[in-house]
A protein has these predicted regions:
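Conserved beta/loop motifs at nucleotide-recognition and modification sites
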Residues: 1-251
Length: 251
C-alpha cells in the first residue's frame, strides 16, 4: 500500500510541536513551500545560543555528498540536535550517495535537503530511504483556479478574513507567484493591524496594492454573466489602455 503523502500543513504542525524528523527532502517546482518549511526549522530546532556550534548551512554548488554525510554524522555540542541545511541541493552531482546515510540517520541530526525546481527519482535509493526514515515532500505549483481559496486559507491561518472578490482580485493580479503574494499579504496584515481591523476588502486592496476594484477580471466575468455588455466593454477598454493592470491577454 502506497504511503500517504504528507501535506505542507502537517509538516509545519509537527515542526511547531517539535516532532522533528531526522531527514527532510523538500523538492519540487514551487520554492515557496520549501522556503517556508526550511525557515520554520531554522527558527524551531535550535535556541539562538546553540546555533554557533550546531547549525550548518551548505550550498549544493560548493559541497558534495561525502561532505554532507561527514557533517551529518557529527554529534551536537551541548544541544539535543544539530541542524544541517543544504540549499540548492539540486546542484550536488553525486546526491544519490546520501542514501547510505539516510538509510540509517542519526536521531540527533536534522538534515534538510532543499532540492528546488526538480524532483528526485522516487524509484531510486535516496527518495526511497527518505520516504521510509524521514519526510519526502514534493512542493507543487498551485493551479490558478485554486488560488482564491488558497489565499482565503492563508489569511484564515493569520486569523484574518478576506472578501471573495478581494481574494479573486489578488489571484488575478498576482497569479500563482506565492512569494510575491506573501509579501503583499504581509503588507495588508500590517495595514489591518494599524486599522484594528480583521478583514481584507476590495477597497483595501485598491488603496494599497493598486488593483482597481471596478476594472478587474472578477468584474468582467460578472458583467458577461449578467449580459451587461456596456460594462464588459468598458472593462475591456480599460484593460487595453492599462495592460499592466490586466493579468490576462485580451483577444
Amino acid at each position: 500500500m502506497a504511503k500517504k503523502e504528507i501535506t505542507f500543513e502537517e509538516i509545519c504542525r509537527d515542526i511547531t510541536a517539535r516532532k522533528f524528523q531526522p531527514v527532510y527532502v523538500l523538492m519540487g517546482e514551487e520554492p515557496f513551500f520549501i522556503d517556508q518549511i526550511t525557515d520554520l526549522l531554522l527558527k524551531s530546532v535550535l535556541e539562538e545560543s546553540e546555533r554557533d556550534f550546531n547549525q550548518i548551512i551548505l550550498y549544493g554548488a560548493d559541497t558534495d555528498a561525502i561532505s554532507i554525510i561527514n557533517a551529518a554524522r557529527r554529534f551536537p555540542m551541548m544541544s539535543e540536535y544539530q541542524l544541517i541545511v543544504v540549499r540548492e541541493a539540486q546542484l550536488v552531482r553525486d546526491i544519490e550517495l546520501l542514501s547510505s546515510y539516510v538509510k540509517n540517520p542519526l536521531s540527533s541530526t536534522i538534515l534538510v535537503i532543499n532540492y528546488k525546481y526538480k524532483t528526485l527519482d522516487r524509484r531510486r535509493a535516496l527518495a526511497a530511504a527518505t520516504d521510509k526514515n524521514g519526510i519526502l515532500y514534493e512542493s507543487k505549483k498551485i493551479p490558478d483556479y485554486k488560488m482564491p481559496s488558497f489565499i482565503t486559507s492563508l489569511m484564515q491561518q493569520r486569523s484574518i478574513g478576506i472578501d471573495p472578490k478581494a481574494a479573486q482580485m489578488l489571484s488575478d493580479f498576482l497569479g500563482n507567484d506565492l512569494n510575491r503574494l506573501n509579501k503583499e499579504l504581509d503588507k495588508l496584515a500590517i495595514i489591518l493591524a494599524e486599522k484594528a481591523s480583521k478583514r481584507i476588502t476590495p477597497e483595501l486592496i485598491e488603496q494599497n496594492i493598486g488593483i482597481s476594484k471596478e476594472y478587474n477580471n472578477f468584474e468582467l466575468i460578472k458583467a458577461l454573466a449578467m449580459k451587461d455588455i456596456l460594462k464588459a466593454n468598458r472593462i475591456a477598454q480599460y484593460f487595453e489602455k492599462n495592460p499592466k493592470s490586466n493579468p490576462i491577454q485580451m483577444t
